[in-house]
A protein has these predicted regions:
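Beta-propeller blade signature
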Residues: 25-40, 84, 88, 156-177, ...
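Short, conserved, GDST-rich strand-edge loop motifs in beta-rich repeat architectures
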Residues: 13, 17-27, 143-163, 206-220
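Structural signature of eukaryotic scaffold interfaces centered on beta-propeller domains
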Residues: 1-12, 59-73, 79, 124-137, ...
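Loop-centered beta-sheet repeat module
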Residues: 24-93
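Coil residues (strongly favoring Ser/Thr
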Residues: 13-14, 29, 95, 114
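Loop/turn-rich, solvent-exposed surfaces of beta-rich toroidal or solenoidal domains
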Residues: 123-174, 179
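Surface-exposed loop and turn segments in beta-propeller and other repeat-based domains
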Residues: 1, 41-62, 97-123, 182-188, ...
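Hydrophobic beta-strand positions that form the internal "hydrophobic ladder"
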Residues: 15, 76, 140-142, 201
Length: 228
């Protein structure tokens, strides 16, 4: 399995990629290393973390696969949407460090019930999202969704596709210390579409509830880090 938030990484002759969770086995590895010369595969020693409800194997939604992974040139960093911690791994995953990266806007993740969840739950419950590495400023950006509300007339599945109603970005330094966490205005930006460039971080403002939204144009706003 490889998605835009879990891109394969090639280091010399080895390709590191992610694999789908298997709920029915005891040890459920997240990643696999593939030797590009011999085509041999090796599952890496890092399992999908447990979370409230993960013991239920037959379910409507599978939260295990909700995560992102980035590579900073030395380490892989995993951000599971249901976990306040991030996981920092060496390429071979023989060393895994768990680091608390908790939002200041909510105390704990509010997971939808795996069997009875409704689309609205995915719009209003608090949890985390993707993590990006910024090599130009040597910082990391972790998206967090605080508890929210669903406005009258808003279709929940459409809102989810555009990054929900609001969000914050937890900014981490190269040692994973929190530098700040700005909260962004309602219905303005789409945090699922972000670009890191030498001049700054670009976040799409093509949110369908933004008054300036144009279905024919994908637009961005540039943000720069400023020391306080």
């Amino acid at each position: 399995m490889a998605t835009a938030s879990q891109l394969p990484v090639r280091i010399e002759d080895t390709l590191y990629t992610c694999i789908e969770p298997d709920r029915l086995i005891e040890h459920d590895p997240v990643s696999v290393a593939i030797n590009m010369n011999t085509k041999e595969e090796k599952k890496l020693p890092f399992d999908y973390p447990d979370y409230p409800g993960s013991e239920v194997k037959l379910k409507r939604y599978g939260m295990e696969a909700s995560y992102s992974r980035c590579y900073d040139g030395q380490r892989f960093i995993y951000s599971f949407h249901y976990d306040e911690n991030i996981y920092v791994a060496t390429p071979e995953h023989d060393s895994i460090r768990k680091v608390s990266v908790k939002s200041k806007y909510f105390d704990k993740v509010q997971l939808p019930d795996e069997l009875t969840a409704s689309p609205e739950d995915f719009c209003v419950n608090a949890w985390y999202n993707n993590l990006l590495y910024d090599p130009y400023r040597e910082v990391y950006y972790r998206i967090a969704y605080p508890p929210s509300t669903l406005d009258k007339g808003v279709r929940p599945m459409e809102l989810v596709q555009f990054g929900r109603k609001n969000f914050s970005i937890i900014i981490l330094d190269k040692d994973f210390r929190i530098l700040g966490e700005p909260l962004f205005p309602d219905n303005t930006y789409n945090p699922t579409i972000m670009l890191v460039r030498p001049e700054g971080l670009y976040i799409s403002d093509s949110h369908y509830l933004n008054p300036r939204f144009n279905d024919d144009i994908l637009s961005f706003r540039k943000f720069e880090l400023v020391e306080e």
